[in-house]
Swiss-Prot record:
It comes from Rhodospirillum rubrum. It catalyses: nicotinate beta-D-ribonucleotide + CO2 + diphosphate = quinolinate + 5-phospho-alpha-D-ribose 1-diphosphate + 2 H(+). Transmembrane segments: none annotated. Pathway: Cofactor biosynthesis; NAD(+) biosynthesis; nicotinate D-ribonucleotide from quinolinate: step 1/1. This is Probable nicotinate-nucleotide pyrophosphorylase [carboxylating].
Amino acid sequence: MRPNHPVAALSPFAIDEAVRRALAEDLGRAGDITSTATIPAATRAHARFVARQPGILAGLGCARSAFALLDDTVTFTTPLEDGAEIAAGQTVAEVAGAARTILAAERTALNFLGHLSGIATRTRRFGDAIAHTRARLTCTRKTTPGLRGLEKYAVRCGGGSNHRFGLDDAVLIKDNHIAVAGGVSAALSRARAGVGHMVRIEIEVDTLEQLAEVLAVGGAEVVLLDNMDAPTLTRAVDMVAGRLVTEASGGVSLDTIAALAESGVDYISVGALTHSVTTLDIGLDIVVAPPKAERA
């Protein structure tokens, strides 16, 4: 099942912060010395962002910011919005202004646009594979350091939903917590006593025996069914019988996700949405350049 809510907006402050870091990394101490050396300062250019392959678009705000942060007179225009389906050969945006600025910001803009569109595209593929079921697709915290907010936004652009943004969003008792705490019962009872009533508690289990203990002890609202095959997952969902929200996770691929979703599980979390993404191929093509270089 695909969520039908609109894509939640991404803060422009979050966009600018990430793009500033990327520009600083790329421009270094002296800026784009190649463009400065070869292109007169007064030269203007017009370029198009063109998709080289089909996919789902994400990251327009980052691409726009890459130019605006260097020169607010550069214009960035697009008829599209993040989440749009794009075809190979389609123009997704255009930029016009100082040629030096366009070339200096080009790679930063393309890096964000390609990376985030790659996440959105992969998310859509996983979502399409389970669209015939009630299961909802969600991401994980397996994100690129410093880019979590952007990457989780791209997941939403692709039709997925977000799991925890950080460790302070909810309690998620994993296998290592259980091992250190002394077992499922001890971990659950301490968690329930240690957080307020408004905090949701999820616990990870990897066997049906652990699941039975969770159901007997109580205290959790969500159970994460880790690395279970489809038949075992179906038995687990039957055991829960609607008493807890169920989430399947662990080694989920495009080849396996449909069978897992058909078990009746509520959510399927997929780390591969963000941790091993292939960039969507988008290029920037200069379409208008002066026939003769102007003097600075």
